[in-house]
Structures are given as structure tokens and as C-alpha cells.
UniProtKB/Swiss-Prot annotation:
Family of this protein: Belongs to the UPF0251 family.
Signal peptide: none
InterPro entries on file: UPF0251
Classification via PANTHER family: PTHR37478, UPF0251 PROTEIN TK0562 (PTHR37478:SF2)
Organism name: Syntrophomonas wolfei subsp. wolfei (strain DSM 2245B / Goettingen)
Official protein name in the record: UPF0251 protein Swol_2090
Length: 130
């Protein structure tokens, strides 16, 4: 039996939840879902240009886990851009920086790990990602 997924620490929530090709109504486009923690990995590594070890530390994951998140995010973005699909940012297993843990449903302090032990709630898109 697989262990429960751990929360990834996210410092930034996107202001928009969907990007799409210009001139085509969203209702006519297929979508690719990017999880919030995947966008955070892209932001830390590619936008802020941090070293992978620093990115992993900020997200409170191991370096191999960070690498897997980053590779998955880049593959999804490349697929969406090359095939003209919309990109929707939603879902995932994450907690906001030193703030609110959506899974534990309470405030967490700076440096406090999210050790949520409840039942992991998988979204429909999580089930299709495997």
C-alpha cells in the first residue's frame, strides 16, 4: 500500500487559473492541468533561477521529488504549448508557505512541517495523471 502523499510547500498562488491560445474560446479547447506545486517548481527553478537543492528545501521535499515535480510540469507545459491546448492551474498536494494548510485546515507557522495524516483526496485529474 502506498503511503499518503505529503504536502509540498508553496509560496505563491497564481493570480490566474487558466492560460489559453488567443482567438479560440475556452469552451472549444482541450485543457492540460498543472498542479499548484508543479507551477511552484517552475517558478522557483526557471523564473527565480534557484539551484535545485534550494528549490527542494523551500518546497520541503527531497531533491529527487523536486526533480520529478519539475519534469512533470515541464512536460505538461510543452505538450500544451505544442498542441494548442489551454493550461489550467489547480489541485495538488500543497500547503501555503507560513500560512494556511488547506489539507490540515489550520494555520501553520514558518518552518513547521506539514505532517498531515488524514485521508488524501484525489481529484479526477489526479486519477488520470497516473
Amino acid at each position: 500500500m502506498a503511503r499518503e502523499p505529503r504536502c509540498r510547500r508553496v509560496e505563491y498562488m497564481p493570480r490566474v487559473e487558466c492560460f489559453k491560445p488567443a482567438g479560440i474560446p475556452l469552451s472549444r479547447l482541450e485543457e492540460v492541468q498543472i498542479k499548484v506545486e508543479e507551477l511552484e517548481a517552475i517558478r522557483l527553478k526557471d523564473y527565480l533561477r534557484l539551484e535545485q537543492e534550494d528549490c527542494a528545501r523551500r518546497m520541503q521535499v527531497s531533491r529527487p521529488t523536486f526533480q520529478r515535480i519539475l519534469v512533470e510540469a515541464r512536460a505538461k507545459i510543452a505538450y500544451a504549448l505544442s498542441s494548442g491546448r489551454a493550461i489550467r492551474i489547480e489541485g495538488g498536494n500543497y500547503c501555503m508557505g507560513a500560512g494556511y494548510c488547506r489539507r490540515r485546515q489550520r494555520e501553520i507557522r514558518e518552518g513547521e512541517p506539514c505532517d498531515f495524516k488524514g485521508i488524501a483526496i484525489r481529484t479526477e485529474s489526479d486519477a488520470t495523471d497516473n
